[in-house]
């Protein structure tokens, strides 16, 4: 049997081809799996479970079919969909996990996380993350009318895009460093949790890294985004493979 891991689909009505690919994946490849783990940024943006979205409804329906068939579907919130709540999770049959979390994967302890906690060189983002993960902030934000939340999200996205553009136009090497994981934080995370295998997304740099951390041989698996093609990690008792999914 096989366990599947995906992240960073960034589903959005403006990119229906990605949603179509994901729905096909749920119909054709996920059934019969031991489990499906979605490690954040399933959606491009999420400003509350009460936001009308036919596309999100279709995704929830497809996930619920998979879950009802006996395939557990686990979800870790990402930096784009950290406000996804219990109401949508119930409709979609999702089991929300903390970030990070430990699982037993065919006898191997593995640490799962979205991945943004590893990007400690991006100090402004980490400050924003701390603010927006505060329960009081989230409760206040979600209590606002939908129009106000939409306006806030649009303003935040524009500010983020402007900052990214400014960084890219400056020191490109510095941009690549800041937006990737910090090696020191990777080492500290392996040591903190006492594991030798970690799976995460967020950086959109799919790879399987072999490294030394604290004198131990460790593996860090990075999931890919779905902008140009799908990306799925398949794990069984014999090992793992990081595969791509082509659009029709």
From Swiss-Prot:
One of its GO terms (cellular component) is cytoplasm. Keywords: Cell inner membrane, Cell membrane, Hydrolase, Lipid A biosynthesis, Lipid biosynthesis, Lipid metabolism, Manganese, Membrane, Metal-binding. It catalyses: UDP-2-N,3-O-bis[(3R)-3-hydroxytetradecanoyl]-alpha-D-glucosamine + H2O = 2-N,3-O-bis[(3R)-3-hydroxytetradecanoyl]-alpha-D-glucosaminyl 1-phosphate + UMP + 2 H(+). Binds 2 Mn(2+) ions per subunit in a binuclear metal center. It is found in: Cell inner membrane. Its main location: membrane. One of its GO terms (biological process) is lipid A biosynthetic process. GO terms for molecular function: manganese ion binding; UDP-2,3-diacylglucosamine hydrolase activity. Mn(2+) 2 binds at residues 41, 79, 114, 202. The keyword Manganese applies. Its cofactor is Mn(2+). Substrate binds at residues 79-80, 122, 160, 171, 174, 202. CDD domains: MPP_YbbF-LpxH. Pathway: Glycolipid biosynthesis; lipid IV(A) biosynthesis; lipid IV(A) from (3R)-3-hydroxytetradecanoyl-[acyl-carrier-protein] and UDP-N-acetyl-alpha-D-glucosamine: step 4/6. Pfam families: Metallophos (PF00149). It is a peripheral membrane protein. Hydrolyzes the pyrophosphate bond of UDP-2,3-diacylglucosamine to yield 2,3-diacylglucosamine 1-phosphate (lipid X) and UMP by catalyzing the attack of water at the alpha-P atom. Involved in the biosynthesis of lipid A, a phosphorylated glycolipid that anchors the lipopolysaccharide to the outer membrane of the cell. This is UDP-2,3-diacylglucosamine hydrolase. It comes from Stenotrophomonas maltophilia (strain K279a).
